[in-house]
Amino acid sequence: MAVIEVKVPDIGDYSDVPVIEVLVAVGDTVKKDQGLVTLESDKATLEVPSAAAGVIKELKVKLGDTLSEGAVIALLETADGAAAAPVAAPAEVPASKPPVAPSHRAPAEPPAPKPALASGKPADIECKMVVLGAGPGGYTAAFRAADLGLDTVLIERYASLGGVCLNVGCIPSKALLHAAAVIDEVAHAGDFGVDFGKPKITLDKLREYKEKVVGKLTGGLASMAKQRKVRTVTGVASFVSPNELEIVGADGKTQLLRFEHCIVAAGSQAVKLPNFPWDDKRVMDSTDALELQEIPKTLLVVGGGIIGLEMATVYSALGSKVTVVEFMDQLMPGADKDLVKPLADRLKKQGVEVHLKTKASEVKADKKGVTVTFEAATAGETPALAATTYDRVLVAVGRAPNGKKIGADKAGINVTERGFIPVDRQMRTNVPHIFAIGDIVGNPMLAHKATHEGKLAAEVAAGEKKEWVARVIPSVAYTNPEIAWVGVTETEAKAKGLKVGVAKFPWAASGRAIGIGRTEGFTKLIFDEETHRIIGGAIVGVHAGDLLAEIGLAIEMGAEAEDIGHTIHAHPTLSESVGMSAEVYDGTITDLYIPKKK
């Protein structure tokens, strides 16, 4: 018998990701690719699989631990001579395409399934390119493929294009967050002598406004699809063979589509915890919460990540008494703790209760409401919150990929135990003419990542010699204040032993921030101490997401502190805080007094 270490594989840009569930115990017999622990990032949950079959001899982790790539999860006793299986290399691409390295974001790749034979039936639809899913990544891929001359079909399960993001995600939530921000701003206008009185909320009109915003964007996409001669098909599609898809419409009728190239952009779905009564409409996921069925007097939000906190911001502004419970010891796990503090302080002032290291262990629904019993994250400790009855409960604990819901095995596509589809740096799956993009290929599950991946996949399919070259992917929480970061975080730098310099400019010293009464924020830049190039940055404050792009561009261009500081920023603006942070690092700042080190 041999004992091997099972380690955390490559999980992309994430580090210090908390363990929210241990799925095995010492003595358990596990199969290869069976899940061992579940990790929770800011927007998704990740299940780490076993690299081999065997018996768990020792667990090296417990609930609440934070893990990064390479961390040992368990000691596994395998059969004689057995060892952890190496990650399978992506299938070699055709001779006309240059071979590329596996993506650093791709999950571990299992053995490829044997594809099904072609159906032999006449096709209802034939095309050069089919894109499965019309979210931001999918419609971008379809439009780019059409622009490059490929006869393209775009399949979407919703009646309108845009996927989760436009229909029930990013866009409607930002419309509601704008309304929440206006309510909050009006509430503080009295501080400078302008009193609007208590706002009157007409829920029907607010819902109508949200739907109007969504309609403008989805309608625009439909128009652009027609202009590009992209054929759109509404229905749920699954593979029949490596070159065929079956599409089932809302009326139950099926169509067979035959293609030369395919881009899978089938996205993800909200994780639904098993101990919640999901048949009760008072228990909601993020999609339900965006419907604004009512403004509950009391709302429990389970999960203190980005999605949970954004919806807590909306409902608190609308008048709900909101309670947030988070399993970890900070809100928004994955972000640096200093970024979260201004938000936590403001939520407290607004009356939002936050309970960390707390788990919802039992949930029961009756006529009185939804009663939730809590447990402390640490065994044996008393929970900070007693059993309480709420009008509604929102569960926001991440999203799971849809890789196992599209019949990928019939096309011979590799899908991990968790449901991700591994890809290389050209977004190819192990089947050379099939690509995958967006949430379904791995974290972070962000629309702007999917958009860039979709464009790349379409260009490669059309014959262009390209691969993924972006260094960083930005993250934004549209809370109040907003929290935005890109590149290496302080937490990640510490975990990796990087020698970095950190420079902060407090918005309390910003004329613009003082003028608008929002001085709780700050701008932070992180530099490599050896090269003096910027490798990360973050902003906390109003419009932080809009301000972050300069930092991302600086990282992509390999800028030094001097480059940023010598760029003249308009005054007075919030954006000049980026330049001033660079001056703090460079030691040339005049808008702050920082004693020189002796």
Regions found by a protein language model. Name each.
Residues 2-83, 153:
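Small cofactor-carrier domains centered on a conserved lysine used for covalent cofactor attachment
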Residues 279-296, 388, 392-460, 552:
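FAD-site-proximal beta/loop scaffold in flavoenzymes
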Residues 103-107, 120-121, 125-127, 143-150, ...:
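Glycine-rich flavin
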Residues 121-137, 295-307:
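Beta1/beta-strand and adjacent pyrophosphate-binding region of the FAD-binding site
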Residues 1, 78-127, 378-381:
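Intrinsically disordered, low-complexity linker and terminal tail regions
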